[in-house]
Amino acid sequence: MKVESVTKEETKKPERKIKLAIAKPEDYSNKNVILEKEEELICPVCGSKNIIKDYERAEIVCEMCGCVLQQNLFDVGPEWRAFDHEQRVKRSRVGAPMTYTIHDKGLSTVIDWRNKDSYGKDISADKRAQLYRLRKWQRRIRVSDASERNLAFALSELDRIASKLGLPRNVRENAAVLYRGAVEKGLIRGRSIEGVAAAALYAACRRCKVPRTLDEIAEVSRVDRKEIGRTYRFISRELNIRLAPTNPVDYVPRFASELKLPGEVESKAISILQKAGEKGLTSGRGPTGVAAAAIYIASVLQGTRRTQREVADVAGVTEVTIRNRYKELTEHLDIDVTL
């Protein structure tokens, strides 16, 4: 029998090049702010996006077909474990995370205002004057030029308005990103810093589906409603911001909470607005007026009635607007309301 010799190259299996398709989703906190883009892996075998990280085996695996996309991962987390927030804060050895709401993104050093050392002991009286001077010069060197000074003022104004309106953290971050984008494109020249900050906050509220009206923002800012609206339209066009019309449903939780209405009324109002949207009754009408009318109808139907004046004061509309929207909703949705 003749045995043919097989070379090593002939026995070598053909290599299969695996190319990972990379997608970049918009992800920051609750997926409303575009700050950092994290790579999303797509399985090259089945095309699934259900990719899981197995920390015990240090592998990235496709949940659908089991293909191992990456192995021998490094654990970049802390070496300690914490079981509650208090332990996490106590054991952490790093500072606050980076934020866009501070002009230097929170990366510079800040001297604490309390006159205590690293052990928590009071600083002696003879060293307090020196600490005061260090603190003063530290504040000065954080702002190096006029542009940083203007940015610091704008972000402080933005934070002040957001605090007055009780807006969450993600809205503030989003507004800061929009304002920085306006600065980079030179959109601030010829306009007031307060006006651009208020307009950026209004756009961030709409993007994050935490709606606030122009009147509400103008009430706590130093500019009028007309200027905020004009600046908002300008920066939306220049920054290519595409925002859908405000949904009246987004106003219902806040209005219902201020009126101290139970959850049943809120759910009923949302149901009414969803049916109204399917029939096109919300198009071309102010979202606050439609939401106020739906809440008024729901409160009557659920036996926890609020007067039109009470609802109008919370929603920032007139009683006439509520009556007009009330008439449209009850007639087109066949809602029998006994007053």
From Swiss-Prot:
It comes from Methanococcus maripaludis (strain C7 / ATCC BAA-1331). Belongs to the TFIIB family. A zinc finger (TFIIB-type) spans 39-70. GO terms for cellular component: transcription preinitiation complex. The gene is tfb. The lineage of its organism: Archaea, Methanobacteriati, Methanobacteriota, Methanomada group, Methanococci. This is Transcription initiation factor IIB. CDD domains: CYCLIN_TFIIB_archaea_like_rpt1 (cd20549), CYCLIN_TFIIB_archaea_like_rpt2 (cd20550). Keywords: Metal-binding, Repeat, Transcription, Transcription regulation, Zinc, Zinc-finger. GO terms for molecular function: DNA-binding transcription factor activity; TBP-class protein binding; zinc ion binding. It holds the Pfam family TFIIB. Zn(2+) binds at C43, C46, C62, C65. GO terms for biological process: transcription preinitiation complex assembly. Sequence repeats lie at residues 156-239, 250-331. Stabilizes TBP binding to an archaeal box-A promoter. Also responsible for recruiting RNA polymerase II to the pre-initiation complex (DNA-TBP-TFIIB).
